[in-house]
From Swiss-Prot:
Active site: Y308 (o-(5'-phospho-dna)-tyrosine intermediate)
UniProt cross-references to SUPFAM superfamilies, sorted A to Z: Prokaryotic type I DNA topoisomerase
Organism placement in taxonomy: Bacteria, Pseudomonadati, Pseudomonadota, Gammaproteobacteria, Lysobacterales
Gene: topA
SMART domains: TOP1Ac, TOP1Bc, TOPRIM
Topo IA-type catalytic domain mapped to chain residues: 133-573
Region of interest: Interaction with DNA: 167-172
Keyword Cytoplasm set for record: no
Originating species: Xylella fastidiosa (strain 9a5c)
Binding site for Mg(2+): E9, D82
Catalytic activity reported: ATP-independent breakage of single-stranded DNA, followed by passage and rejoining
Name of the featured protein: DNA topoisomerase 1
Length: 815
């Protein structure tokens, strides 16, 4: 029987480690967090030292039971969850559960950490156990408590003032503000015209282009020429003076070094995977998790291919450095090796939480060697990690930049530049991606012919080119992660979840690979920026993150931080609940006056989303409403465009003695005849669609509906229907199976009723009714961690919890 129990977070990791440790160990997975705050008000109690009440997570109950069962027979227990705050908290929760159940009285329980899943790393960790780091646990608990208090208290204010079902998060909201402010910059941007002038030179050795840098003796700047007439006049003056040639006045050669980027940390891995591979942050972390936990490599079995992927550290272990340097010498020559390893400095004060950068566990496993065992996406990400780590330990690239000035007379000067690689260095392996290219990037790789001062170069022609200034680009995932990192908002473990939350809550949409805020997102951001300014302030959020870091290092206590945050936050929430109306909330935009009725026209967030409205609730007549068309926004729609929307519904005519009309509803454009509604196709415009097309769509839908019904029964709700997976029986509430050996159309009512009794399942999924009263709750106290007594546990009854879930937790408490 195994003597030791080792607990990790994922089953894949458990499988890999179990292979390394052998029969003396049982390796089990917790499947992530095992407990969370109880889903009801008071889960964090500011009046009682911010005591926190926990509940087992439903889906992980069986895994906790498996761990408990194994712990009873084990001689010792090792907690081997991830080497960061979340991992430390999971270990603490597991230890508390086992302690509550009386399983730690006579056996040692220790914490071990490792940043790679290799036999050496696992065995070394077991030889160097430690106690659970209470500072890391405190930092995680403080973060969780802050997120709960913000979400639980701020989200209901959004429900009342903006729209039901919305949520606000401590870190999510500043990230949303970034995206919204960028969109406002884009909308406010005024395009300016400007012109550039180029000389096409016909050098005998090679044709090349040169850009005008001086016109009429003055420096040529971006807006020196802003119209075509001025550009054409300048072109004529230069051509007249040049007389078919340009005179070389200066040739400059300059060498510069480009140093390799450090090995990946979480944020740079996410940014590069977005730029080079087109991966979302979520996909990057999911694939990296698989590579970290273990991939089956044929006879070698399951092997962890990369180190832990949630890290702020750019350090590499001595063993890793030695192996990487051996690879460089073998594959790229000793000339590609620096005299000593390249050392990089991390920006994060907390990089000690996870001790290494993201790197291959063994550089000897080249991307080519492991390719047969990896999916295409896994291979591409592994290759990225491998190349970045290897390149980080190579010599700099040496680039030579040549700059040539060519004059037309004494008043006009052009400049040609080119950059060539003299020594490849790390560029032989890897080149870092960029979000936006600049002029230097355009010159790179461009060679110029050998030229000397005093020579003349034949001029082929002078070209003018029109340009327009461009607004700042929307944030891509890579750019947003970079901005969050630069502001100090969020941490490696949270970037992907921040983005996922914004998308899930429909506060932003993806337009191509860029974020565009939705009207709901803009309304939420505007409301928070106007009335909870401090709590979406970038510096405030970053400072709070720094204080959480300080707690994790043991430099600050978590209770004083909670008090400092909670007292003013609570006062502000209470004030705003009663003092604001929807106009103050920023979800209403006045557009002007309707010329027909003389009433006010506004854009606003309604119950079902963005809409426009004619009139107000104070008018004698009820206000009229109209939904927006796709790609319209209440923040940019004009008065004329809004009034156009009220032409809906349009009556197209009659068909089958019934009126046919089109309109725009909460789910988009539709056509209607009698009681039959059908959504318009993407190519159909509700403002131009004709009667023939609308009736075709309606008839098509009715034909499909007729074919769906195989059999009706007189005086009964039961029908025999065609479904996605074949024929079935339904009474609208239950769906039942039809035996494969029965002809659906031949079923009698009695047979159908019996089949519903025997095989019927709810037509719609119901919420889980699993009881929670028997679960353990614990509190995290200011002075010590202890379990609640039996009476406290019994207070968490079934019905109040479910009621609270429905009424209060719907906002989703997020960062």
């Amino acid at each position: 029987m195994p003597k030791h129990l080792l607990i990790v977070e994922s089953p894949a990791k458990a499988k890999t480690i179990n292979k390394y440790l052998g029969k003396d160990f049982t390796v089990l997975a917790s499947y992530g967090h095992v407990r969370d705050l109880v889903p009801k008000e008071g889960a964090v109690d500011p009046e009682n030292g911010f005591a926190m009440r926990y509940d087992l997570i439903d889906k992980n109950e069986k895994h906790v039971e498996a761990i408990t069962k194994a712990a009873k027979t084990a001689d010792s227990i090792y907690l081997a969850t991830d080497p960061d705050r979340e991992g430390e908290a999971i270990s603490w929760h597991i230890s508390e559960i086992l302690k509550e159940r009386g399983l730690l009285k006579d056996k040692p329980m220790q914490r071990i950490v490792f940043t790679e899943i290799t036999p050496r790393a696992i065995k070394e960790a077991i030889q160097k156990p430690r106690m659970i780091a209470s500072d890391l646990v405190d930092a995680q608990q403080a973060r969780r408590a802050l997120d709960y208090l913000v979400g639980f208290n701020l989200s209901p204010v959004l429900w009342r003032k903006v729209q039901r079902g919305l949520s606000a998060g401590r870190v999510q909201s500043p990230a949303l503000r970034m995206i919204v402010e960028r969109e406002e910059e884009i909308e406010a941007f005024i395009t300016r015209e400007y012109w550039s002038i180029h000389a096409e030179c016909a050098h005998p050795a090679q044709h090349f282009s040169a850009k005008l840098i001086k016109l009429d003796g003055q420096k040529f700047e971006q807006f020196t020429i802003t119209d075509s007439d001025t550009a054409a006049a300048a072109q004529r003056r230069i051509q007249q003076v040049a007389q078919g040639r340009l005179h070389i006045t200066d040739v400059t050669n300059k060498e510069r070094k480009r140093r390799p980027a450090p090995p990946f940390i979480t944020s740079t891995l996410q940014q590069e995977a977005s730029r080079k591979l087109g991966f979302t942050t979520r996909k990057t972390m999911q694939i990296a998790q698989k590579l970290y936990e273990g991939i089956a490599l044929g006879e070698e079995g399951s092997v962890g291919l990369i180190t832990y992927m949630r890290t702020d550290s750019v350090n590499l272990s001595l063993d890793a450095l030695s192996e990487i340097r051996d690879i460089i010498a073998r594959d790229y020559g000793t000339n590609a090796l620096p005299d000593k390893p390249n050392v990089y400095t991390t920006k994060s004060k907390n990089a000690q939480e996870a001790h290494e950068a993201v790197r291959p566990t063994s550089a000897l496993r080249t991307p080519t060697q492991v390719a047969p065992y990896l999916s295409n996406e896994e291979h591409r990400l592994y290759e990225l990690v491998w190349k970045r780590a290897v390149a980080s330990q190579m010599i700099p690239a040496i680039l030579n930049t040549t700059s040539v000035d060519l004059a037309a007379g004494n008043e006009h000067v052009f400049r040609a530049t080119g950059t060539t690689v003299v020594v490849q260095g790390f560029l032989a392996v890897y080149e870092e991606g960029k979000d936006n290219k600049n002029a230097e990037d355009d010159d790179e790789g461009r060679k110029l012919p050998v030229m000397k001062t005093g020579e003349n170069v034949p001029l082929e022609r002078i070209l003018t080119e029109q340009h327009f200034t461009q607004p700042p680009p929307r944030y891509t995932e890579a750019a947003l992660v970079k901005a969050l990192e630069e502001y100090g908002i969020g941490r490696p473990s949270t970037y992907a979840s921040i983005i996922q939350t914004l998308l899930f809550r429909k506060y932003v949409d993806m337009e191509g690979r860029s974020f565009r805020p939705t009207d709901i997102g803009r309304a939420v951001s505007k409301f928070l920026a106007s009335h909870f300014t401090r709590y979406v302030d970038y510096d405030f959020t970053a400072h709070l993150e720094d204080e959480l870091d300080a707690i994790s290092r043991g430099e600050e206590e978590w209770i004083p931080l909670m008090k400092k945050f909670w007292v003013p936050f609570k006062e502000l929430v209470e004030d705003k609940k009663d003092s604001l109306d929807k106009t103050d909330a920023g979800s209403v935009r006045l557009l002007g006056i309707d010329p027909t009725s003389g009433k006010e026209v506004s854009g606003r967030i309604g119950r079902f989303g963005p809409m426009v409205q004619i009139g107000t609730v104070d008018d004698e007549e009820k206000p009229r409403f109209a939904s927006l068309r796709p790609n319209q926004s209440i923040y940019s729609i004009s008065l004329e465009e809004a009034i156009e929307l009220f032409k809906m519904p349009r009556v197209l005519g009659e068909d089958q003695s019934q009126q046919v009309s089109v309109g725009i509803g909460r789910f988009g454009p539709f056509a209607k005849r009698g009681s039959t509604y059908v959504s318009l196709k993407s190519e159909d415009d509700p403002y131009t669609i004709d009667l023939a097309r609308a009736t075709f769509l309606i008839n098509e839908k009715e034909e499909i509906a007729r074919n769906r019904i195989i059999k009706n029964f007189e005086n009964s709700q039961i029908q025999v229907l065609n479904g996605r997976f074949g024929p079935y029986i339904s009474d609208g509430k239950l769906n039942g199976k039809i035996p494969k050996d029965r002809e659906p159309a031949s079923l009698t009512l009695e047979e159908a009723q019996q089949l519903l009794i025997d095989t019927g399942k709810p037509a719609r999924k119901n919420f889980s009714t699993k009881k929670t009263a028997t679960k353990n709750e614990t509190r995290k106290q200011t002075t010590k961690k202890r379990t609640t007594d039996a009476k406290a546990t019994k207070k968490v009854s079934d019905k109040p919890v479910k009621k609270q879930i429905k009424k209060r937790i719907a906002p989703n408490i997020t960062e």
